[in-house]
């Protein structure tokens, strides 16, 4: 040790303390002057007008013209993702009452451009089941927001519509089942009754009745700044009808996800239970947080539990409410609504 440090230890210690204190003050001052990164504002691009297809592309196959002579019965899944996770857009293209598949034909994928028009993302070709898949990687995702999609058959200009929703990671969601949860009847109760249940809905002969307070609870959750997910065991053929029903009944807008395969409709854990579980887990993998979930069936309880939704935030209507420590709703939402209104709005990583 040097003579100076030996002779003046107090002075040296005092100087060192002052230096550290000064450095801390400078760092704190710098942090105070550095603005926090602003939360992104959600864009809502849902008012664009899709121009009429002026020139149809020639059909790849002569048989396609015959198939397309029936009424278009196309469908497409809504897409929900975060800014850090690419997605695959999917659609199913068929015609007529027998739902004849459109095979090996081109479909153009368009997105609302936020300026009153649509822009093309590219094209895809249907497979032998009438389906298309179109990958949209993370770099091509639009800014956080809600965007209308149009999947247009190039041969005749018919369209399947869907919505793309993009949020920052750690966005908190609320999930709703539909049949038996928002409606008074459940298609999942008896496997043998599935066809009988869905056929009147498909034909338009029956309009499902909503549970008392169901519209209000979705409106409340939306007002609390939760994006909503409508997760149902309904088959893809009911996509358009289900969207229309949610809209005309006054339910808050949300992401609709239906089954893609007949096995997923089955009212068992291995059927609709696994379908819902896997979809919810895919949302978690994309960076979402499942804040609460509403259902009515044991398959809902299974799926929500498997996706790690807390039983205290799992609300079950009907006779299964309370099972597995879930929260019973009874036959309506009148008791639940006042309690839900007391909840503070969540901290979300976006602003509207």
Predicted region positions:
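Bacterial N-terminal signal peptides
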Residues: 14-24
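Short beta-strand edge segments in extracellular beta-sheet folds
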Residues: 163-169
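C-terminal cap/substrate-recognition subdomain and adjoining C-terminal extension
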Residues: 33-64, 113-119, 187, 193, ...
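Bacterial N-terminal signal peptides that target proteins for export
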Residues: 2-15
């Amino acid at each position: 040790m040097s003579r100076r440090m030996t002779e003046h230890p107090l002075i040296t210690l005092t100087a060192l303390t002052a230096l550290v204190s000064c450095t801390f003050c400078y760092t704190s001052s710098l942090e105070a002057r550095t603005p926090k990164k602003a939360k992104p504002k959600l864009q809502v691009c849902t008012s664009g007008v899709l121009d009429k297809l002026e020139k149809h592309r020639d059909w790849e196959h002569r048989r396609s013209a015959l198939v397309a002579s029936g009424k278009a019965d196309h469908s497409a899944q809504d897409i929900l993702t975060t800014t850090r996770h690419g997605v695959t857009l999917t659609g199913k293209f068929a015609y007529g009452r027998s739902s004849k598949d459109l095979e090996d034909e081109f479909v153009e994928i368009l997105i609302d451009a936020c300026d009153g028009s649509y822009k093309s993302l590219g094209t895809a070709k249907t497979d032998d089941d009438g389906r298309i898949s179109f990958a949209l990687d993370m770099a091509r995702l639009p800014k956080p927001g809600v965007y209308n999609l149009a999947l247009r058959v190039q041969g005749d200009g018919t369209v399947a519509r869907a919505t793309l929703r993009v949020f920052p990671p750690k966005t908190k969601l609320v999930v709703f089942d539909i049949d038996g949860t928002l409606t008074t009847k459940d298609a999942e109760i008896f496997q043998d009754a599935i066809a009988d249940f869905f056929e009147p809905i498909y034909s338009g002969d029956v309009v499902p009745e909503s549970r008392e307070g169901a519209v209000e609870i979705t409106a409340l959750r939306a007002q609390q700044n939760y994006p909503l997910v409508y997760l149902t065991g309904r088959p893809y053929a009911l996509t358009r009808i289900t969207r229309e029903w949610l809209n005309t009944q006054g339910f808050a807008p949300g992401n609709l996800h239906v089954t893609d395969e007949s096995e997923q409709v089955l009212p068992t854990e291995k059927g609709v239970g696994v379908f819902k579980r896997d979809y919810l887990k895919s949302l978690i993998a994309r960076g979402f947080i499942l804040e609460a979930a509403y259902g009515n069936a044991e398959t809902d309880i299974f799926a929500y539990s498997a996706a790690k939704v807390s039983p205290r935030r799992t609300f079950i209507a009907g006779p299964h409410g309370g099972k597995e420590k879930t929260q019973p709703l009874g036959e309506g939402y009148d008791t639940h609504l006042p309690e839900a209104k007391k909840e503070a709005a969540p901290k979300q990583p976006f602003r509207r």
